[in-house]
Regions:
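Alpha-helical transmembrane-bundle signature of multi-pass membrane transport and export proteins
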Residues: 2-423
């Protein structure tokens, strides 16, 4: 039996009370909620800064979107190796301060009349690099903060908060942008990172000392060790494959749906916004139902059973059209994102539960590299299929991918796992 399987075989310890009543997790939860809310605001504000204040064209706006995520592909794997050598919370605090400075420079330069598109790109890229380190360190810090027996509960709270801030943050952002100029709205995100850093400072440096990584091993060797660890582990490999397939398929849909709904079907843009808002609701509901469903059906079993049950609903998305088919497609999108919410809780908890402390950074970085890479491939594939075969063909390809995401889990030891720590 592997180390991962031995970890999963251990019975979960009872959780006496909600994690939200415990100060350390409450501080982390508050930091995450505030910074995610700020990020949701700036996701609207930054493109508007480019368009309204700097008169950017479509290619420049696309470049900004690319710069916000490309850091995971460029430095994600080295960041994981570096985080494994370092205490996690100081890394998170430093990343928050860097993000606050980078984004805070945008309204400052605008107020002085010195803001340029190059400055905006640099701020987005620097913030993206800091986000890589923050996310990897945050995922790696959670087992230390709450204990491995309460990971599912902790992740359920965090994923729910993420979904709520995605829904509410864009609403707040829209109202804020109606009241102030877009560059000033970016200041909200910068302030949210300062708030997050202040909360993390109150947590202290952490009780677990920095792992004593073999300093004779270079970063390249440590990256290779992380890749091999994920690929050879019977729990992590199917999670990576299923997650990559899910992300690729979701991104295929999200890329072409705006073209199909607004251009080919001629529906107003608010319909598209409402359609995607349904997806945010699905993630929220899935994250809240993850623990009870895992208890009812088994933590491993719920992953592949939900994937199998959701498969037909991906076909409804591909059938989107005017009238009743629009409602059917919205139902398909709701159910599909409901599964994503469950996955975000259960899969992340599995990942954290089976990985030794000294490998957490590299494991999380490898997973983020795979998942972000799948998003990039999905975007490129959507463009290729949409150009050659039409946007409807891209939706059918996404439906096929969504119909297959349960296979890696069903063919792995996860299919027999009933209890995950904290469920």
């Amino acid at each position: 039996m592997t180390t991962a399987q031995q970890t999963l075989a251990q019975p979960p310890a009872p959780a006496p009370r909600s994690l939200l009543t415990e100060r350390p997790f409450r501080l982390l939860y508050t930091a995450a909620a505030v910074s995610k809310l700020g990020t949701a605001v700036s996701s609207l504000a930054i493109p508007l800064v480019a368009v309204v204040a700097l008169h950017a064209d479509a290619a420049q706006v696309g470049l900004l979107a690319t710069l916000s995520t490309v850091a995971f592909l460029l430095i994600g794997l080295p960041a994981g190796a570096w985080v494994d050598r370092s205490p996690k919370r100081p890394v998170m605090i430093a990343a928050d301060l860097v993000r606050a400075a980078a984004l805070g420079s945008v309204p400052a330069a605008w107020a002085l009349g010195r803001l340029t598109f190059a400055h905006l790109c640099a701020a987005v890229l620097v913030s993206g690099v800091a986000t890589v380190f923050f996310d990897v360190a945050s995922l790696s810090n959670l087992p230390e903060l709450v204990g491995r027996d309460r990971l599912t509960e902790a992740n359920a709270h965090l994923v729910t908060t993420d979904a709520l801030t995605q829904i509410g943050g864009r609403t707040v952002g829209g109202l804020l942008l109606a009241a102030v100029a877009a560059p000033a709205a970016v200041l909200v995100d910068a302030a949210s990172y300062l708030w997050s850093a202040a909360c993390l400072l109150r947590l202290g440096p952490g009780t677990t000392p920095a792992p004593r990584a073999d300093r004779r091993a270079g970063i390249r060797q440590e990256i290779g060790a992380g890749l091999r660890f994920v690929w050879r582990d019977p729990v992590l490999r199917p999670i990576a494959l299923a997650g990559g397939c899910t992300n690729l398929s979701i991104q295929l849909s999200q890329t072409v749906l705006p073209l199909l709904i607004t251009r080919e079907l001629g529906l107003p843009s608010w319909v598209l916004g409402l359609f995607f808002a349904v997806g945010g609701l699905g993630v929220l509901l899935g994250s809240r139902c993850a623990r009870p469903l895992a208890r009812r059906f088994g933590a491993g079993r719920v992953l592949w059973l939900m994937g199998l049950a959701v498969a037909p609903f991906g076909l409804l998305i591909a059938l989107v059209d005017r009238g009743g088919w629009l409602w059917a497609a919205a139902l398909g999108w709701l159910v599909t994102t409901f599964k994503v919410g469950i996955d975000n809780v259960v899969k992340v908890s599995f990942r954290q539960a089976v990985t030794p402390d000294h490998m957490l950074g590299r494991m999380n970085a490898t997973m983020r590299f795979v998942l972000t890479g799948a998003l990039c491939v999905g975007s490129a594939l959507a463009g290729l299929l949409g150009t050659v075969l039409g946007v409807r063909a891209a939706l059918w390809a996404a439906a096929v991918g969504l119909a297959l995401v349960w296979v890696p889990i069903a063919r792995s030891p996860l299919r027999r796992v009933r209890a995950l720590p904290g469920t």
